[in-house]
Swiss-Prot record:
GO terms for biological process: 3'-phosphoadenosine 5'-phosphosulfate transport; transmembrane transport. One of its GO terms (cellular component) is endoplasmic reticulum membrane. Keywords: Developmental protein, Golgi apparatus, Membrane, Transmembrane, Transmembrane helix, Transport. Belongs to the nucleotide-sugar transporter family. SLC35B subfamily. InterPro entries: SCL35B1-4/HUT1 (IPR013657). This is Adenosine 3'-phospho 5'-phosphosulfate transporter 2. It is found in: Golgi apparatus membrane. Its main location: Golgi. The gene is Papst2. Mediates the transport of adenosine 3'-phospho 5'-phosphosulfate (PAPS), from cytosol into Golgi. PAPS is a universal sulfuryl donor for sulfation events that take place in the Golgi. Essential for viability. Involved in glycosaminoglycan synthesis and the subsequent signaling. May be involved in hh and dpp signaling by controlling the sulfation of heparan sulfate (HS). It is a multi-pass membrane protein. It holds the Pfam family UAA. The chain crosses the membrane at residues 50-70, 77-97, 115-135, 138-158, 164-184, 195-215, 228-248, 266-286, 293-313, 317-337. It comes from Anopheles gambiae (African malaria mosquito).
Length: 377
């Protein structure tokens, strides 16, 4: 119309949907709970601070107790028995939570899927626990920080996902930092054991597979968290109990831990309880603040865990730990940033072409059109 003001609208702008998402997030029907504690009526900042405090407090105790258990003389061969006890605790915690909530929802995920999840969970936690007996604890934590590498491969193979260049840059940075950290550890640790590296590497492979299988199963069947915990750890407990019974390691583990009940079962209870509660809080943090922010918080927690490990448990230190650890942190930052940036390989090609033309002082290439569509009304 003549004389009317024209307004420019950006098609595909993320801000167009921002209010709709905000209204949905603030709807009264959406409950935010950590176990039996309702956080729905707190504002977003308070929810974030409470979740952060819980993550740091619980996982710092978790890491401390895990390393403390392996300081017990003679406990090193019993990492798998510790996993068996941990599975029993997790199953009990999940059953108690489900009973208190009085949930009568039938099982959502097929038993065949749970059988696979239990096997992968057993591999992840059993191999990870066993590696503590052979590796410097900070090295084990650094390996676990680099979970993105096998997860990236697993998501492509299992779910057929496509990833941008930032994800691959992040994985490359993590690989480099991991190699440098391991080399530094082998130089300062007189009892450096390659078998520990082998164990934690297998644990990461299982972790990558379980993350993708679990995500796919929970997305398709919409199973509650406590159901996944009960069946995954319950079936895993049966697997491991049968294997250890047939191999004779179950009797040996029971006999050893009977001599040190507080240092084994008592510490394992705190170790398992803090781990179980920590999982619930991380899931709540993901639900309220998003996965990138949750990844940032858990990464900061791991950095503090490594620092406290050097404080509470005497071990040699080299400045190479710091530099290689910072490279890993940079890789994690790139991974978090990739969730917000939709950079593609085509974008990289255009950027490289622009830089190439600028260096050679060539005229700019003709743009086939702006990526942002404009509509004038």
């Amino acid at each position: 119309m003549a004389g009317a003001k024209s307004e420019v609208i950006y098609l595909g702008d993320k801000d167009l949907n921002r209010n709709r998402h905000r209204d949905r997030d603030q709807s009264p029907e959406r409950e935010i709970k950590i176990l039996f504690f309702d956080l729905t009526h707190y504002n977003r900042t308070t929810q974030f601070l409470l979740c952060c405090g819980g993550v740091f407090a619980l996982y710092l105790v978790y890491g401390y107790m895990q390393e403390l258990i392996f300081t017990l003389e003679g406990f090193r061969p019993y990492g798998w028995y510790l996993t068996l006890v941990q599975f029993a605790y997790y199953t009990a915690f999940g059953y108690i939570e489900r009973s208190v909530e009085r949930t009568t929802v039938p099982r959502c995920i097929p038993l065949r899927t749970y059988a696979l999840l239990a096997f992968l969970t057993l591999g992840t936690m059993g191999l990870s626990n066993s590696s503590v007996g052979y590796l410097n604890y900070p090295t084990q934590v650094i390996f676990k920080c680099c979970k993105l590498i096998p997860v990236l491969i697993g998501s492509v193979l299992i779910q057929g996902k496509k990833h941008g260049p930032m994800d691959f840059f992040a994985a490359t940075a993590m690989c480099l930092g991991l190699i440098l950290f391991t080399l530094a550890d082998s130089q300062v640790q007189p009892d450096f054991n390659r078998f520990g590296v082998f164990l934690i590497s297998l644990a990461l492979l299982c972790d990558a597979a379980i993350g993708n299988v679990q995500e796919k199963a929970m997305r398709e069947h919409r199973a509650p968290n406590n159901e996944v915990v009960i069946y995954s750890y319950g079936i895993g407990f049966v697997y491991l109990a049968v294997i250890m019974l047939l191999s004779g390691h179950l009797v040996q583990g029971v006999a050893f831990c009977a001599r040190y009940p507080m240092e084994t079962y008592g510490y394992a209870f705190l170790f398992s309880l803090t781990g179980y509660l920590g999982i619930q809080i991380v899931l709540t943090l993901v639900r309220t603040c998003g996965a990138p922010l949750a990844a940032t918080v858990t990464t900061a927690r791991k950095a503090v865990t490594i620092a406290l490990s050097f404080v509470f448990f005497s071990k040699p230190f080299t400045i190479q730990y710091l530099w290689s650890g910072l490279i890993v942190v940079f890789g994690i930052y790139l991974n978090v940033y990739s969730k917000r940036s939709k950079l593609t390989f085509a974008d990289l090609g255009r950027m490289a072409s622009t830089v190439y033309r600028w260096v050679l002082r060539l005229p700019p290439a003709k743009d086939g059109g702006s990526r942002t569509s404009l509509l004038e009304v």
